[in-house]
């Protein structure tokens, strides 16, 4: 169901900043932050656990002064937990529960039980059911369960990892949205990812660590249920020239860009330019370029800027971190400033001259900030629109005037269909990360956009596509949206990895990855590191585990709330967290300064994804390194294209990887046998739980 842009929604701002940062002092609570409203609106006694793995375990009680002690301890099973109450009274039993609460459980295992006065505590160890006065078991949730007072079944704002149980009419939880994942222990008929109607996450709405977003299958199955209202309003973008024009320092290899070969395919190619002066930018734009620290053109800029200024359609392929965003923003802004185009304020229907589309919220916001930087002090007004923020807030920003609309695909279609944005004046259509925009992930949205009323035909608009990778089938598909005489610029090799990144591939068994990861991080604790995994649950598990091991960590993926995603990136950019664990949502386009190391904890399934991941380091002439944990059993499909990427980038190719890539089935069988023997002899190595592969949801 689409969001209602026309209804005012009362703003509900988050009261804390979520992160996984490590303990600074012994008495610091790092996993939760309370406001006065939190204290007044919650039940103080709650337990949470992560089923079989021990996981996080948080226990809270309410001492008279509301102060909470902080203590970290190991939970049972494989995992970790926090105990937030050190003040057990004499009335409490061995599990730390008093007679009033009637909750019983095993730490790290879940399993709570409510019973009448005088009964002994009981718990269904490991299965976390609850018991009422009739001794009936309900809710065999493997992840915690819930309690009953006086025989009443409810979730009572607890946010427990409970299941919906065996009864169809079991009430849903509200306020703290607990886990209810069919993959992680759901036994009820109404399984799904998150029984709560609000935020969900590791611990619930006003707490910090999150594994799921609380997206319930109930919400999708019940047609009459209203979608959750989005109330988040992002903070305003940085103000003041010092913040707007913060410079990204180029590295020692920046001048080597001139050595990269450039190939331009097409007829009547405009000549390349060598300096910004040759671009004939207006004075204000030239001054903003200088303030931003741009001194020398990169190869993709030298060729793309004159092509766009000549009015030609363009498909450009250049390595990660080589200045593609400026390559299309500068000629677009130059045209608008030369034509004297200004924003028309407070019109119900805004008709931008340029629309820029990117696959992720973080990337499109980054492009918007660049457009805002280059257009500073002019009458050109860029606006950004993406999912996860309050619709009314976004619409008010659009109504103030919009010349350049930066948007994610789904939100763009929504705002166009509601006739808030018109397309009749569109001159430039830009697809950043074009291969991702045209694959099966976003192809239907792009096709819908092209057929919207008012969309100029490809003959009457200028279409620009940029990416670091272009599979052959995507290049064929792109021709449907480009003029027949479009140009194709290739800087270096199509789909090639950045040559400034030192790549290492390690053969690893699954149960040895965590130990190796800790070894790498301990040997370079001050390095800013991005760790990539293939599932959202694993991202949060690893981030939490690293936090327990005293590494300042956070995570970002499609199931986290938007303010959590923005906060995680901010913590990583500013150095508050030196490690961020990511899924594919952070693999493309993000330009984070001083990322020194990228670790592929899970090797991606496609080699193009590998190129984008390792491209988070080694940007703008800086050097970086990438380490990949290659599990032969899971990753052999990517072996041959990975060897080509390493060879083309002049990196060392391990002999075992070449054998897998070109040795046929016999080589694979021998590796499988060795891997199987290694698994049996693995001992007590720290093992990451196996999580089912899931699609990265909510990119938009």
UniProtKB/Swiss-Prot annotation:
Helicase C-terminal domain boundaries: 513-661
Residue spans of biased composition, Gly residues class: 193-203
Chain intervals for the UniProt region annotation (Disordered): 1-241
Domain named Helicase ATP-binding: residues: 305-488
Signal peptide: none
Motif (DEAD box): 432-435
Locations listed in the record: Cytoplasm; Nucleus
Membrane-spanning parts: none
Compositional bias (Basic and acidic residues): 45-62, 89-104, 130-146, 215-228
InterPro entries, per the entry: DEAD/DEAH_box_helicase_dom, Helicase_ATP-bd, Helicase_C-like, P-loop_NTPase, RNA-helicase_DEAD-box_CS, RNA_helicase_DEAD_Q_motif
Name of this chain's protein: Probable ATP-dependent RNA helicase DDX4
């Amino acid at each position: 169901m689409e969001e209602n842009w026309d209804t005012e929604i009362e703003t509900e701002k988050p009261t804390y900043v979520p992160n996984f940062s490590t303990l600074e002092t012994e008495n610091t609570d790092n996993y939760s932050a309370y406001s006065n409203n939190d204290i007044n609106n919650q039940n103080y006694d709650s337990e949470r656990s992560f089923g079989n793995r021990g996981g996080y375990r948080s226990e809270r009680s309410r001492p008279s002064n509301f102060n909470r002690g902080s203590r970290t301890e190991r939970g049972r099973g494989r995992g970790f937990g926090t105990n937030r109450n050190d003040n057990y009274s004499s009335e409490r039993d061995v599990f730390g529960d008093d007679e009033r609460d009637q909750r019983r459980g095993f730490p790290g295992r879940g399993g709570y039980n409510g019973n009448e006065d005088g009964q002994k505590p009981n718990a269904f160890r490991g299965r976390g059911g609850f018991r009422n006065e009739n001794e009936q078991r309900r809710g065999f949730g493997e992840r915690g369960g819930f309690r009953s007072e006086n025989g009443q079944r409810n979730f009572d704002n607890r946010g427990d990892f409970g299941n919906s149980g065996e009864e169809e009419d079991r009430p849903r939880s509200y306020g703290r949205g607990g886990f209810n994942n069919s993959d992680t222990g759901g036994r009820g008929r109404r399984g799904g990812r998150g029984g709560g109607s609000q935020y969900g996450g590791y611990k619930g709405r006003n707490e910090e660590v999150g594994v799921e977003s609380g997206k319930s299958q109930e919400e999708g199955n019940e047609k009459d249920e209203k979608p959750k209202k989005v109330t988040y309003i992002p903070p305003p973008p940085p103000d003041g020239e010092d913040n707007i024009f913060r410079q990204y320092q180029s590295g020692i290899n920046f001048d080597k860009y001139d050595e990269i070969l450039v190939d331009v395919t097409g007829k009547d190619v405009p000549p390349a330019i060598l300096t910004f002066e040759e671009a004939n930018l207006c004075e204000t734009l030239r001054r903003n370029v200088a303030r931003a620290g741009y001194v020398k053109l990169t190869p993709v800029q030298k060729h793309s800027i004159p092509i766009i200024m000549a009015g030609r359609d363009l498909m450009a392929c250049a390595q990660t971190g080589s200045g593609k965003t400026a390559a299309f923003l500068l000629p677009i802004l130059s045209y608008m400033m030369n034509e004297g185009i200004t924003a028309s304020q407070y019109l119900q229907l805004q008709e931008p001259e340029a629309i820029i589309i990117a696959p992720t919220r973080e990337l499109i916001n980054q492009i918007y900030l660049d457009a805002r930087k280059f257009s500073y002090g002019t009458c050109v007004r860029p606006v950004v629109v993406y999912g996860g923020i309050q619709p009314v807030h976004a619409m008010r920003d659009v109504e103030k005037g919009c010349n350049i609309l930066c948007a994610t695909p789904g939100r763009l279609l929504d705002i166009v269909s509601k006739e808030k944005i018109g397309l009749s004046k569109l001159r430039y259509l830009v697809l950043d990360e074009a291969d991702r925009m045209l694959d099966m992930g976003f192809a239907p949205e792009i096709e819908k956009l092209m057929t919207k009323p008012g969309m100029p035909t490809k003959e009457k608009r200028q279409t620009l596509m940029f990416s670091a990778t272009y599979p052959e089938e995507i290049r064929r598909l792109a021709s449907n949206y480009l003029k027949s005489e479009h140009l194709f610029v290739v800087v270096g090799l199509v789909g090639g990895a950045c040559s400034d990144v030192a790549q290492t591939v390690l053969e690893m068994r699954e149960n040895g990855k965590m130990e190796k990861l800790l070894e790498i991080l301990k040997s370079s604790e001050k390095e800013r590191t991005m760790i990539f995994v293939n599932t959202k649950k694993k991202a949060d598990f690893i981030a939490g585990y690293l936090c327990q091991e005293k590494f300042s960590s956070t995570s970002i993926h499609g199931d986290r709330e938007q303010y959590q995603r923005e906060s995680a990136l901010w913590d990583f950019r500013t150095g508050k967290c030196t490690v961020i664990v990511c899924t594919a949502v952070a693999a493309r386009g993000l330009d984070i300064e001083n990322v020194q190391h990228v670790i592929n904890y899970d090797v991606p399934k496609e080699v193009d994804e590998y190129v984008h991941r390792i491209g988070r380091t080694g940007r703008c002439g800086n050097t970086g390194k990438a380490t990949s944990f290659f599990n032969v059993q899971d990753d052999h499909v990517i072996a041959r294209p990975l060897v080509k990427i390493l060879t083309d980038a002049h990196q060392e190719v391990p002999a075992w990887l070449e054998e897998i890539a070109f040795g046929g089935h016999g080589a694979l069988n021998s590796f499988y046998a060795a891997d199987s023997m290694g698994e049996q002899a693995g001992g007590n190595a720290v093992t990451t739980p196996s999580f089912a592969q899931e699609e990265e949801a909510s990119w938009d």
